[in-house]
């Protein structure tokens, strides 16, 4: 079968709505996707390609999200590998590889230095074929059970009800979002969490809460996910985790989830009381020069496109 390939744009992105449902059995809005791929504040925008059948049906997509990135101590533009989707009836036809290569070529033309990402077990083999490089340590996840039953998850799967639930969350929790001062000085390589980053991340519904002078950037989508924390240390960690778990239970979340790079400050604090496990590989593909090292890069949950 022949496929027509078109670049992602503010117009064509609406075709991802039915494709998203067919590929992932999840409903997303055109508005959500538009905000996610609108990265004008960084420079390059709508970096990705869609494959169509001769009848005009969108059946595959691959896209990356440009961001400011610290690489070897210097500020550059990188891009995070984001949505990878293929309609179930059009898989194993080479569409992922084709769209990815076109996307990387476009990104290179836009002077994007590298693509990075956290592929799951299903997409990992495909990225290996694309000659991605992977760090020796994966992202680490810490999971705390908060309740035996998650009504938040049930609501999350019902868009109409979850909208009402989100309105209630906005009433119970702060609708404040973090700014650059929340993160402090950038020391390690990785995503630069400046005001541009913080404004962009508003495409997802998140909240900023304070527990005993510790601030946490959270997302509630059936689970309570911690994007980043400020002020956490060995002395207050136990009390913070206990209060956070209680909040998660009241919000109907079964689990509290932290995710961070190994050897980060957050990792060092959490591992004293919680047991980590591997979450996702950390991979990258240089686009401008093969002499790229990500050995000193560190990531938090908030850096991922799924937070």
Model segments located where?
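Conserved acetyl-CoA binding element of GNAT-fold acetyltransferases
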Residues: 75-88, 221-233
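Conserved acetyl-CoA-binding loop-helix of GNAT-fold acetyltransferases
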Residues: 86, 91-105, 235-246
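A short beta-loop-alpha structural element at the N-terminal edge
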Residues: 2-16
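Basic, Lys/Arg-rich alpha-helical nucleic-acid-recognition elements, primarily the DNA-binding modules
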Residues: 38, 46, 63-66, 72, ...
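Active-site/acyl-donor-binding loops of N-acyltransferases
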Residues: 47, 66, 113-163, 212-235, ...
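Glycine-rich phosphate/pyrophosphate-binding loop shared by adenosine-nucleotide-utilizing enzymes
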Residues: 56-61, 79, 212-216, 224
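Amide-forming acyltransferase catalytic core, primarily the GNAT-like/NAT-type
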Residues: 15-16, 21-24, 28-44, 124, ...
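Short hydrophobic/aromatic beta-strand element in the GNAT-like acyltransferase core
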Residues: 46-50, 61, 83, 205-209
């Amino acid at each position: 079968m022949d496929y027509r390939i078109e670049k992602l744009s503010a117009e064509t992105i609406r075709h991802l709505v039915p494709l998203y449902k067919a590929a992932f059995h999840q409903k997303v809005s055109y508005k959500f996707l538009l905000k996610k791929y609108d990265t004008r504040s960084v420079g390059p925008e709508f970096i990705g390609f869609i494959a169509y059948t001769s009848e005009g049906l969108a059946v595959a997509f691959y896209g990356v999200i440009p961001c400011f990135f610290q690489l070897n101590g210097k500020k550059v533009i990188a891009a995070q590998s984001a949505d990878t989707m293929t309609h179930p009836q059009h898989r194993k036809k080479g569409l992922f590889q084709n769209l990815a290569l076109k996307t990387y070529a476009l990104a290179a033309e836009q002077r994007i230095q590298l693509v990075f990402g956290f592929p799951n077990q299903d997409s990992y083999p495909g990225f290996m074929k694309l000659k991605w490089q992977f760090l020796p340590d994966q992202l680490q996840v810490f999971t705390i059970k908060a309740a035996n039953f998650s009504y938040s998850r049930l609501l999350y799967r019902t868009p109409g009800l979850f909208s009402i639930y989100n309105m209630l969350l906005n009433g119970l929790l702060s609708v404040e979002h973090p700014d650059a001062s929340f993160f402090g000085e950038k020391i390690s390589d990785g995503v630069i969490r400046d005001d541009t980053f913080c404004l962009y991340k508003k495409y997802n519904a998140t909240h900023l809460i304070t527990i005993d002078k510790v601030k946490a950037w959270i997302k509630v989508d059936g689970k309570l996910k911690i994007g980043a924390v400020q002020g956490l240390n060995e002395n207050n960690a136990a009390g913070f985790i206990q209060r956070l778990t209680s909040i998660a239970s009241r919000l109907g979340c079964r689990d509290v989830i932290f995710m961070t790079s190994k050897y980060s400050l957050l990792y060092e604090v959490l591992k004293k009381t919680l047991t980590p496990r591997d979450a996702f590989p950390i991979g990258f593909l240089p686009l401008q020069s093969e002499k790229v090292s990500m050995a000193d890069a560190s990531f938090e949950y908030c850096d991922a496109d799924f937070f």
